[in-house]
Amino acid sequence: MPGTPVSDLSAAAAVDAPALLPLPVARPSAPAVVRGKLYIKTHGCQMNEYDSAKMADVLAASEGLELTDNPEEADVVLVNTCSIREKAQEKVFSQLGRWKALKAGGKPVIIGVGGCVASQEGEAIVKRAPYVDLVFGPQTLHRLPELIRARRESGKSQVDISFPEIEKFDRLPEPRAEGPSAFVSIMEGCSKYCSFCVVPYTRGEEVSRPFEDVLVEVAQLAAQGVREINLLGQNVNAYRGAYGADAGDAAQYADLGLLIRTIAQIEGIGRIRFTTSHPLEFSDSLVDAYRDVPQLANYLHLPVQAGSDRILSAMKRGYTALEFKSKIRKLRAVRPDISISSDFIVGFPGETEADFEKTMKLIEDVGFDQSFSFVYSRRPGTPASDLQDDTPEAVKQARLARLQAHINAHAASISQSMVGSVQRVLVEGPSRRDPNELTGKSENMRPVNFPGNPRLIGQFVDVLITEAMSNSLRGRIQLDDSAQ
């Protein structure tokens, strides 16, 4: 695999494609000396989950802090916040109020607030809750060791919510695998500025990690036994990773399609996913990757938000319902049975019954498998927060219930249709409900539970689906020599 030219991947990828560098083999590092305990409470998206894991890595490497699930025994207590939903700030201050007691009796506990609410509120958090020691944004989590030391040395609260572009990734420890599936962040921020969204203001505009840096991280994880890579970004399919800028050469850029093709060549990687996407950036290059790369999961999460062109325009999404459906048709031409999930906002300011019916028509036409659906939540500082909203809350809730019921019914029919089929499942570990069984996910993100030998954990197995449950599937392994 080392030295394999990316230009060999396909004719489509051959134009100005980089050659793969020899990728390092990850070697286990000596465990840090444990000098204290760390507790992290995480709210929000998968990007926050990834960031929290990196906080733990940074503080384990530099401060010797070991994770605990009990804040009362922790030396450092952090909350990684999300500002997408309504009343996010109040929920954070409520959490902080409960933690204030941790400092009783002069215990030198460090309390920190990170994430998107931290970016929005900054110094205001310390003014309202002066017992908070650290406030840091998503782009400055790598500076946690310096912030903690500065707090202890100066006795003053530390606030750093700057946007130092890609510096964060340059200063993180080598990745540590914690199971057969891993998240890899390939970009930060968003430059779309949808009228309802705070992400560009809390995480900054789009910045992509260099192409080769991503490949190195994936190779390190693969060497540690990771078999499934989940590529992360607020607008992940806008990825433009620089390469080939040595010796004064002008940089070239790899898009998500080329990144996926290249990751698929890394030994050990058997499945690739990515989230979250924007329809505007769903390119023909990505469709071609679905056509050509069998490791790319037969699943796509593509948030559409609404089916009314009038509402999509007010949201500043940049596409029409017809344009969205056109992209889905292109994708299904190369992956006819792909599962597609989406996001919907119900009750956006000015949404009429006719607008909502157009959303339901889009749902029917596309046949979404799953959705993350919410009633519109006004976010201060966004353009949509100034729009008049005169739709009664009861009407919004009724629309949401109808939308979710429709998608849930369709998802149930898909699950039922999988009975009798053989699904490729990555074995993640013992089932939560029955430790004598194994569990993993199908390509279309359904949990699958089945009897099996624990030594199969971390491997792909073929499972015959025998029963569809409300939120999962049951099955049995199609036996071969390795599964005996």
UniProtKB/Swiss-Prot annotation:
Q: Name one Pfam family in it.
A: Radical_SAM
Residues in domain TRAM? 416-479
Q: Where are the transmembrane segments?
A: none
Task: Tell me the compartments it is located in.
Answer: Cytoplasm
Q: Where would I find the MTTase N-terminal domain in this sequence?
A: 36-153
The alphabetized UniProt keywords are: 4Fe-4S, Cytoplasm, Iron, Iron-sulfur, Metal-binding, S-adenosyl-L-methionine, Transferase, tRNA processing
Which protein, by its recorded name, is this?
A: tRNA-2-methylthio-N(6)-dimethylallyladenosine synthase
The source organism is Xanthomonas euvesicatoria pv. vesicatoria (strain 85-10)
Name the gene that codes for it: miaB
